[in-house]
Design a protein with these regions (language model features):
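Glycine-/acidic-rich phosphate or pyrophosphate-binding loops and their flanking alpha/beta elements
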Residues: 7-13, 248-271
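Redox- and metal-dependent alpha/beta enzyme cores, enriched for Fe-S-associated oxidoreductases
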Residues: 267-295, 308-315
Length: 382
């Protein structure tokens, strides 16, 4: 499928794809995500239409908490709804994300991931904001580059409607959100062809309506709450396959090979890095360099972070691997092992795994990462 090329940053790429599936956008600006709702507002003002033939209704609220509450209200009323945020703004949305996920509503929260202020303010990219949402019940999809943001944002929207779960669709703040690239851009006709319109209608039919009222948001005692809460397990079990289904639709249209976990590197790799986000592009260069020197290394790129599919991870890792390094772009004080232990428990690996915190070091080329990373691979994982 031929697509036109345009020059844009990650925020605009996300906004372009999000606008196609959005009927209501509830917004509030916060760096570095502000450009996304600015584009949506600009396009709506200009009369641009989504795939449903409508102009997006944009409402700016008083805060991110208000934007999340309006998202909840809009999605309950049957409108395909998006919002855009980062960092402390995302934290203000957490109470409503719990509700939206618990009620099985397909809202999409587009996030340019940014450090959460702790001892000091930091507006640059890490994953501390999205990690804070891991137990909300929202599915979480990550992109590594501007092109991936364009390609995979539709997957979040299509899978949300099909699988009846909200999505946090995220990419690295500044490193991806503000990186300007010449990329291939979706045509809205192709995006309309990708979504299951019957699922969209099914979602709309369940909307709150005074003509056919129904009860929701009841208070339950522990015995009933436990039972009904466990009932959602099958939804999460089925979501990875649903996400892969829409990745396959993207692959069929674009000739790509997007998977829940993509492997890059030597087929007989003995050392592998598992990482998520913009660092993957640098690691790919590092892998090429090291393999050219005779080493056997590879990279597993995490795309669907929640629900986490152990089966897909195991399938992505070559059988020859002896050592695994897991890059974690968040400091979690008090935790033990963090993402390394998740890989271990999810994959059935029973060898010693130690965490390596991926910090904000300014190196951007493979030589720098090689120098810093190989010592970790060889010494911290002996």
């Amino acid at each position: 499928m031929a697509r036109k090329y345009l020059t844009m940053d990650g925020n605009e790429a996300a906004a372009h794809a999000a606008y196609a599936y959005t009927e209501v956008a509830t917004i509030y600006p916060i760096t570095p995500s502000s450009v996304m709702p600015e584009h949506v507002d600009e396009w709506a003002t200009a009369g641009r239409k989504n795939i449903f033939g409508d102009v997006v209704h944009v409402t700016e609220m008083q805060s991110e908490a208000g934007a999340a509450g309006a998202t909840h209200g809009s999605i309950v009323a049957g409108a395909m709804t998006s919002t855009f945020t980062a960092s402390q703004g995302l934290l203000l949305m957490i109470p409503n994300i719990y509700k939206v996920a618990g009620e099985g509503l397909p809202a999409v929260f587009n996030v340019s991931a940014r450090c959460v202020a702790t001892h000091a303010l930091n507006i640059f990219g890490d994953h501390s904001d999205v990690y804070a949402c891991r137990q909300t019940g929202a599915a979480m999809l990550c992109e590594s580059s501007v092109q991936e943001v364009m390609d995979l944002t539709p997957v979040a929207y299509c899978a949300a409607v099909d699988g009846k779960l909200p999505f946090i669709n995220f990419f690295d703040g500044f490193r991806t959100s503000h990186e300007i690239q010449k990329i291939q851009v979706w045509d809205y006709d192709d995006l309309k062809d990708m979504i299951d319109l019957d699922k969209v209608q099914e979602f709309r039919d369940k909307a709150l309506n005074p003509n056919h009222p129904r009860q929701m948001g009841s208070a339950q005692n522990p015995d009933i709450f436990f039972t009904t809460r466990e009932a959602c397990n099958t939804t999460y079990d089925e979501m990875p396959a649903i996400v892969q289904k829409y990745m396959d639709k993207v692959n069929a249209k674009l000739g790509t090979d997007y998977k829940l976990f993509n492997y890059y590197g030597a087929a007989d790799a003995e050392q592998v890095i598992i990482a998520m986000g913009s660092v993957n592009e640098t690691i790919e260069e590092t892998v090429d360099y090291l393999n050219a020197q005779g080493q056997k290394v590879g990279l597993v790129k995490v795309r669907l972070y929640r629900p986490f599919s152990a089966e897909a991870l195991i399938e992505a890792i070559p059988d020859t691997v002896k050592k695994i390094s897991v890059l974690d772009r968040t400091k979690e004080p008090g935790s033990i092992g963090s993402e390394g232990l998740q890989v271990r428990s999810g994959s059935g690996i029973h060898r010693q795994i130690r965490s390596w915190l991926q910090g904000h070091h300014s190196c951007t080329d493979h030589r720098c990462l090689q120098q810093r990373g190989q010592e970790e691979i060889h010494h911290r994982h002996r």
